[in-house]
Swiss-Prot record:
The keyword Repeat applies. Part of the ABC transporter complex XylFGH involved in xylose import. Responsible for energy coupling to the transport system. Keywords: ATP-binding, Cell membrane, Membrane, Nucleotide-binding, Repeat, Sugar transport, Translocase, Transport. ATP binds at residues 38-45. The complex is composed of two ATP-binding proteins (XylG), two transmembrane proteins (XylH) and a solute-binding protein (XylF). The gene is xylG. This is Xylose import ATP-binding protein XylG. It is an enzyme of class 7 (translocase). Signal peptide: none annotated. CDD domains: ABC_Carb_Monos_I (cd03216), ABC_Carb_Monos_II (cd03215). It catalyses: D-xylose(out) + ATP + H2O = D-xylose(in) + ADP + phosphate + H(+).
Length: 504
């Protein structure tokens, strides 16, 4: 008989007007890596908030069992005492405190009612070694990279004797090298009997590390399958409820004349005005073309495209030409007035006002030009509803708060705001980061639609399959310089990575 360390039985969770979870079942064995997959809004986060005590016992129906024993978690502390720890995508660390202080925050070892600093540092060193992190426990969190901070979070969980570790989109901000380190640590934890619940949209990672996969859709359990007995295509079908013909629905484009051209363009570090981040870059994008820009983190991709849009704090130099005419862009208003729009890398911080509704967010960049002095609220609502319908944004109304939407729907609102400006050039910086496969597919189809209408697309992405799957041409940046350019036909992951790392 199978022994399950965790059983969640017929979990139902309702909010006003919405049933977020509908009799969801989820089970995990001791010492397994169990992936939890589903589109944004499928119920994954809600289920984990029930498990962690964020939604306390009594606010949902159903039962949670740990090692066969029913549990009632009224607080997060209750779930932690039962051995459950959750590491969210937004890491919960205090940047000004040391590694040791963060590991034992709220759980400090005491001696005669005072913090036992010696014991804290000795214990912290032990847990850091457990996760393979070679840093001093006295190092401040702000001096660590994101990958190192994530390992501190895992050490913090282990210090609380976690036997069930939940990781929510753990690799969203990690480099490939950091992802490999994380995977190695999770395999080590598995061998020591720790159960890992791995929530991710990146199916290649899921298939690389998981033993079993459970799929949720629309708040229901669709099924649990063994990784070795399924495929990515089958999981995608379970997630979206239909077959996607291809993950990247590329169609042959017929690019026209050059729309945007950048000549001898350099960008300077705002903290060190003499240092160039982007160095004498030249490129162009044609009408009805997707130009992909690849490169490693720190290569200057975001600084380049944000500067072209007028949104980067560091100064720049060089020339920007639009439809054969030299233009000056000092700020985002200049860019928008010239028909250049940007969907930024960080939608929540740079692309949205989370406390405002969908309508206000979509029309925000167009208020001055579209509605003149007097704001026509009915026209504003009508325009917002048009983009909600066009982009298939899932929401009860355009007056819903943007902060309450799923990641995929938030990204569509940012796209709607950009499209509302009727751009000739649309810059997409990490357009599908952190969103589910169904929403990705819809965004790819939108890109195809825009290109067929003659919009020039510049797409920055850290996902090489996305770059290869959707681009007509590909540029590669390394340390601020263009080190490679490929047509769609000649581009490969190996060629791009060689250029991205300074090789040839």
């Amino acid at each position: 008989m199978d022994h399950y360390i965790l059983e969640m039985q017929e979990i139902t969770k309702q909010f006003p007007g919405v049933k977020a979870l509908d009799k969801v079942d989820f089970k995990a064995r001791k010492g397994e890596i169990h992936a939890l997959c589903g589109e944004n809004g499928a119920g994954k986060s809600t289920l984990m908030k029930v498990l962690s005590g964020v939604y306390p016992y009594g606010t949902y129906q159903g039962e949670i069992l740990i090692n066969g024993q029913p549990q009632k978690f009224y607080t997060i502390k209750d779930s932690e005492r039962a051995g459950i720890a959750i590491i969210y995508q937004e890491l919960a660390l205090v940047s000004e405190l040391s590694v040791a202080e963060n590991i034992f925050l709220g759980n400090e070892p005491l001696h005669h009612h005072l913090i036992d600093w010696d014991k804290m540092y000795i214990e912290a060193t032990k847990w850091l070694k457990e996760v393979g992190l070679d840093v001093s426990p006295g190092t401040k969190i702000k001096n660590l990279g994101v990958g190192q901070q994530q390992l501190v979070e895992i050490a913090k969980a282990l210090a609380k004797n976690a036997s069930i570790l939940v990781l929510d989109e753990p690799t969203a901000a990690l480099t490939e090298a950091e992802v490999e380190i994380l995977m190695h640590i999770l395999h080590q934890l598995k061998s020591k009997g720790v159960t890992c619940i791995y929530i991710s949209h990146k199916l290649n990672e899921v298939f690389a590390i998981a033993d079993n996969i459970t799929v949720l859709r629309d708040g229901r359990t669709i099924g649990t399958v063994k990784k070795d007995e399924t495929s990515q295509d089958k999981i995608i079908t379970m997630m979206v409820g239909r077959e996607l013909n291809r993950l990247f629905p590329y169609i042959n484009h017929s690019p026209g004349a050059i729309t945007l051209e950048v000549r001898n363009f350099s960008v300077y570090n705002p903290d060190n005005p003499r240092k160039k981040i982007v160095k004498d870059v030249n490129f162009y994008v044609r009408k009805g073309e997707v130009l992909g820009i690849a490169g490693l983190i720190g290569s200057g991709r975001t600084e380049l495209v944000t500067s072209i849009y007028g949104g980067y704090p560091g100064k720049n130099e060089g020339e920007i030409w639009l439809d054969g005419r030299k233009i000056k862009i000092k700020n985002s208003e200049d860019a928008l007035s010239n028909g250049i729009a940007l969907v930024p890398e960080d939608r929540r911080r740079q692309g949205l006002v989370l406390d405002m509704d969908i309508c206000k967010n979509i029309t925000l960049a167009s208020l001055k030009r579209s509605y003149n002095i007097m704001l026509n609220e009915s026209a504003e609502i009508r325009d917002a509803e048009f983009f909600v319908d066009k982009l298939k944004i899932k929401s009860p109304s355009v007056e819903a708060r943007v902060g309450n939407l799923s990641g995929g729907n938030q990204q569509k609102v940012v796209l709607g705001k950009a499209l509302m400006t009727n751009p000739r050039v649309l810059i997409l910086d990490e357009p599908t980061r952190g969103i589910d496969v169904g929403a990705k597919y819809e965004i790819y189809n939108l890109i195809n639609s825009l290109v067929s209408q003659g919009v020039a697309i510049v797409m920055v992405s850290s996902e090489l399959p996305e770059i290869l799957g959707m681009s007509d041409r590909i540029l590669v940046l390394c340390e601020g310089r263009i080190t490679g350019e490929f047509s769609r036909e000649e581009a490969t992951e190996e060629k791009i990575m060689a250029c991205a790392t300074g090789g040839k």
